[in-house]
Amino acid sequence: MATPKSFRDNLAEILKTHDFRTVELEFRLGFQAPGEFITNINKHVWTTAKEKLGTPAQELVMVDKYIRSTPGESSRYVVFPDGQGYWEHKKKVAKETTTGGKYGVRSAFSLERRENGKPPVSFRMQRTKYRTTFVKGPWKIDFTRVESIPATDRDCESTYEIEVELYDMFYLFEKELDIIIQEGNKLVQSIVM
């Protein structure tokens, strides 16, 4: 039986066979629950960490209307306050979870594709995201308050998320993948220390 590929090896393979600009490499804080990784952070911890980072590079509100979402793929229409929007299709390729410390880290990478198009007539869930972004070198640090509104008669839910994403994808050509993955993990963990 073949040994499964490591997170790093999966990423290296995808970078060889796909346009690097379609790859999203991210690190999210959270905790491991039975069967799933929860990315909701304590509101006080989230607010305190956000205040430590100083002046943000960007603040924005966007609405995601999901028409399809499975554990491995999602399609959503993203709308900005000016009414402009686009379709985003995301295919999750690999993930790994590191526990220990105050919070665990979910490292993941996906293939993303964006396209113009009309908004959906119906959707299964809507998420309004209030995002504050900080930039640190090639990394983007997002603090996002998310209001999830299911299309069914369930309650609205607010969550507080912290994500570090490799923003400057050319960084992949400057350092070895192991170092980049380590850097992303360390950066996201340092935010709440």
UniProtKB/Swiss-Prot annotation:
<protein>
    <recommendedName>
        <fullName>5'RNA triphosphatase A449R</fullName>
        <ecNumber>3.6.1.74</ecNumber>
    </recommendedName>
</protein>
<keyword id="KW-0507">mRNA processing</keyword>
<dbReference type="InterPro" id="IPR033469">
    <property type="entry name" value="CYTH-like_dom_sf"/>
</dbReference>
<comment type="function">
    <text>Catalyzes the first stes of cap formation: by removing the gamma-phosphate from the 5'-triphosphate end of nascent mRNA to yield a diphosphate end.</text>
</comment>
<dbReference type="InterPro" id="IPR037009">
    <property type="entry name" value="mRNA_triPase_Cet1_sf"/>
</dbReference>
<keyword id="KW-0506">mRNA capping</keyword>
<dbReference type="GO" id="GO:0004651">
    <property type="term" value="F:polynucleotide 5'-phosphatase activity"/>
</dbReference>
<keyword id="KW-0378">Hydrolase</keyword>
